[in-house]
Amino acid sequence: MEVYNFSSTLNPKDLIDWIGKLEDYFELEEIEDPLRVRLAQTKLKEHATLWWKELQIDREEEGELKISRWRLMVTELKEKFIPIDYVLELFKRF
């Protein structure tokens, strides 16, 4: 199973699909935290990787631990790359 890169496109569905593919891969290969985060961050490219590195640096400078839990990484990615109006539109549909 190939897991493709994520480079912060304008389409929020790209992130949702990317997360789903990674979760399928993690389950198939029986990969657990914190290796999930380390593998996922290698698949971030361009703006997404710059943002992730800056987030991790900011956390360290504020005395917090770097993110090492997959669920927290997913939350941060969604907050950054999925606009609230997209979430509201999905909520209205269902």
Regions found by a protein language model. Give the residues of each.
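Retroviral Gag capsid
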Residues: 1-94
